[in-house]
Amino acid sequence: MLPRKREIVAGEVEDLQKKTRAGEGEATREEGDAAMAGRGNEIDEDLHSRQLAVYGRETMKPLFGSNVLVSGLQGLGAEIAKNLVLAGVKSVTLHDDGNVELWDLSSNFFLSENDVGQNRAQACVQKLQELNNAVLVSALTGDLTKEHLSKFQAVVFTDISLDKAIEFDDYCHSHQPPIAFIKSEVRGLFGSVFCDFGPEFTVLDVDGEEPHTGIVASISNDNPALVSCVDDERLEFQDGDLVVFSEVHGMTELNDGKPRKVKNARPYSFFLEEDTSSFGAYVRGGIVTQVKPPKVIKFKPLKEAMSEPGEFLMSDFSKFERPPLLHLAFQALDKFRTELSRFPVAGSTDDVQRVIEYAISINDTLGDRKLEEIDKKLLHHFASGSRAVLNPMAAMFGGIVGQEVVKACSGKFHPLYQFFYFDSVESLPVDPLEPGDLKPKNSRYDAQISVFGSTLQNKLEEAKIFMVGSGALGCEFLKNLALMGISCSQNGNLTVTDDDVIEKSNLSRQFLFRDWNIGQPKSTVAATAAMVINPKLHVEALQNRASPETENVFNDAFWENLDAVVNALDNVTARMYIDSRCVYFQKPLLESGTLGAKCNTQMVIPHLTENYGASRDPPEKQAPMCTVHSFPHNIDHCLTWARSEFEGLLEKTPTEVNAFLSNPTTYISAARTAGDAQARDQLERVIECLDRDKCETFQDSITWARLKFEDYFSNRVKQLTFTFPEDSMTSSGAPFWSAPKRFPRPVEFSSSDPSQLSFILAAAILRAETFGIPISEWAKTPNKLAAEAVDKVIVPDFQPKQGVKIVTDEKATSLSSASVDDAAVIEELIAKLEEVSKTLPSGFHMNPIQFEKDDDTNFHMDVIAGFANMRARNYSIPEVDKLKAKFIAGRIIPAIATSTAMATGLVCLELYKALAGGHKVEDYRNTFANLAIPLFSIAEPVPPKTIKHQELSWTVWDRWTVTGNITLRELLEWLKEKGLNAYSISCGTSLLYNSMFPRHKERLDRKVVDVAREVAKMEVPSYRRHLDVVVACEDDDDNDVDIPLVSVYFR
């Protein structure tokens, strides 16, 4: 059984609810004002690091100065406001003139039953403020006037009549400067967005991608000129792109910085719309870089756009005719609400018919745009569920609209132009719903019941769900599941596991966490917060990593009891493992992921779709070791090398020293046994650390850092260029220093150079830490004292050496080369090490430093950025600031709240289908979306690959079972009856039987499980009744046949 955490969580929930009601832990308005006043344009890089990786400082600063209005605080408005507060705008003003109803609890996670009867906006203010004290959150109640809008940079309306929207949009469109106007609605399983950012809106960066670059190999003197690039990496240029050139030798006319147009772009070449016939002949070198000019977009005001909408932004091309119909449907609903002052009643035939009639009458006025056919069944679904704001739809559209507000305030990314319509009518149950099943039950789920019926609601509440991960995706999922009522009955259960703890950088997206949760387990805190949203949620919070090592926790009984699995993971290895378990136990897996403004979802449904592991992205291309260590040509190479050197000097070598000191005999014996270049290098580093480079004072650390600077950035470069002078030729007669290689030059040290001095001080501080030496305060910032300390270091003159071997083979995997006398050298080093160790004080040990990217006070990134930038200076590569260095060296995954919210909303729309059952593969949807462009690509999942043999067929989802505790011979005969000749049977990594081995025939009459216990040393857990074996088979024509896993049941 799983460890129960219910009692702990429930107690924590009660405390948190008391705090919330008492207002504890929440910012007062005065505190909010103070936070705002103190913030200015300062960006908390620890908090916003993942967001900065998406937007950059140039976007965050105008965003931090923006005031936004969100009108309509049902679920959609709450989601938009949440995303904006997390993004860090200057202020968010909430407007709603309605009061909280029980109905609202289906989609607004800020509200509870205690808020019923209060104004919606006022009920949300304090909880929204708690998400980010640097954002000023306030409420505006009562009637909204045009004059109210003038103080905002962007206004969002989620529940407004069309006439009023047109009035407000006209004001915003003609205002100077224009106010960005967004109208968005979620009506049941249907949603819409309209954007108007004014007569002319300038987009500063249309896609957020880094400008593409190429390394030039040749340029023709022609019209147009043919530009060829090195074949290290494919070019990403497209026809019509603008590019600039730099560092071109010979044809220097191209270095003028003038943007030139690309045409006929190919993987490694393109033509340039330029006559270079009179230019100088190309000699060598050259970098070509994409130029991304600003784009001006002219928006139509809403009134004009309603009658002339232009092209709709598509999402699902199987519904190509759907957007014009939904454009009509939303107008018909608006007319119904205007005339009757209410929404249609769910299941009411009369109300549905009236909406359809309105749609037909509006359609008759459209002239050339009149629709030939109107799908009345679709309009029935639309009208019947239109009052409901469903949580998954609110989450999805909250992400989309939140991102559009960021675009409006910053000019970053291409705006949505201008209408977007979406529906997920496939989420409805397969069987028709009766009107009685849609009636409200005075429940917090009434809105959801009005769309899906009470039968599905009961299934949701009794669901047994396993959610893996409780970070950014996990927080969104927990909020969604709690609002949907998933696992909220006595029979339901939601298990969430995550072995990670909360860090400050999580807080800008993982909104269930607060400052005071830093250091606590993510799963426990998230589960506690989810139970505040819905106290009836039955949740178990675990801190176990789901992996082969924890199959005693997540055992067969656990998996067999599940209804679905939701992944909220951030790495492929874990995803692959969970996918394999879902295939094995035949459980639906709902998969999703984000990368900056991009997100994707994948549905893995037993027997209907392919599994996650069936298709994988190609692995990222790794730079050759010789490129990173001797021939870098971009900053990524420099940073890869910098992190490697950091770990070698400050973590691996001190760890090696401690390994030797803890057990010298064992360590020396292992070095002798290995007897290779790696063992030799390790011994040399340990001796250096304990002898020549041993530090006893902080000045020793300064000396070490200064000499390392000279070694890395001067001596090694001098040796490299001595071995390979600038005019060197390869064995084939080509210049050695040709693209992509860049000829390096040594860096001359100067203590008056702040970047050089800062690097040496940071390196000295970390070196002192490894030796446990107290750090002088004056060393923490560059100053005169620090410069004097560095300048007093005596630096020996460098003398180049003959015969030094430098690895140039791109296929080499090691920089160390074996030598015939390695064993003799190792013996000398061991003798030296034993001698050195006698001089060490008793109890001496070192303190290895493990790289931590998210602490700006620990000097780790100062060292890595310094390493990389000095290296870049050697090779004339553009340098980067510490923040950019952190993104690359720290391998930070760019992340923002908006794409995360959208992904989880889409997944939860699929969860309705998975839990309802009975849906066909064509009802499910996989999605790839990029909110930056914006692009929405929605398609049916791919069915699993089917293998056929004679009259049999199977897929990855099938598992063959054999009962009766059979022998190996009986298993072979069982397969023979299927027309399959088995020649090999294995269990895990052990071979139980192979027809080629005569001795294996002695095993044929033994039980399969007994052979596995003996050969594979396998003990089958007491809770498991079967053993899995992999069988290799051939047909009668000796063709291999891949068969499913075979489970032999023996008890």
Curated annotation (Swiss-Prot):
It comes from Triticum aestivum. One of its GO terms (biological process) is ubiquitin-dependent protein catabolic process. Residues 1-42 are annotated as: Disordered. Disulfide bonds: none annotated. There are two active sites within the E1 molecule, allowing it to accommodate two ubiquitin moieties at a time, with a new ubiquitin forming an adenylate intermediate as the previous one is transferred to the thiol site. There are multiple genes encoding E1 in wheat. Pathway: Protein modification; protein ubiquitination. GO terms for molecular function: ATP binding; ubiquitin activating enzyme activity. Keywords: ATP-binding, Ligase, Nucleotide-binding, Repeat, Ubl conjugation pathway. GO terms for cellular component: cytoplasm; nucleus. This is Ubiquitin-activating enzyme E1 2. The active site is at 626 (glycyl thioester intermediate). It catalyses: ATP + ubiquitin + [E1 ubiquitin-activating enzyme]-L-cysteine = AMP + diphosphate + S-ubiquitinyl-[E1 ubiquitin-activating enzyme]-L-cysteine. ATP binds at residues 472, 498, 509, 522, 570-571. The keyword Transcription regulation does not apply. Residues 56-605 are annotated as: 2 approximate repeats. Pfam families: E1_4HB (PF16191), E1_FCCH (PF16190), E1_UFD (PF09358), ThiF (PF00899), UBA_E1_SCCH (PF10585). NCBIfam families: Ube1. It comes from the Eukaryota. Sequence repeats lie at residues 56-194, 453-605. Monomer. Its EC number is 6.2.1.45. Gene3D superfamilies: NAD(P)-binding Rossmann-like Domain (3.40.50.720), Ubiquitin-activating enzyme E1, FCCH domain (2.40.30.180), Ubiquitin-activating enzyme E1, inactive adenylation domain, subdomain 1 (3.50.50.80), Ubiquitin-activating enzyme E1, inactive adenylation domain, subdomain 2 (3.40.50.12550), Ubiquitin-activating enzyme E1, SCCH domain (1.10.10.2660), Ubiquitin-activating enzyme E1, UFD domain (3.10.290.60). The keyword Cell inner membrane does not apply. Activates ubiquitin by first adenylating its C-terminal glycine residue with ATP, and thereafter linking this residue to the side chain of a cysteine residue in E1, yielding a ubiquitin-E1 thioester and free AMP. Residues 1-32 have a biased composition (Basic and acidic residues).
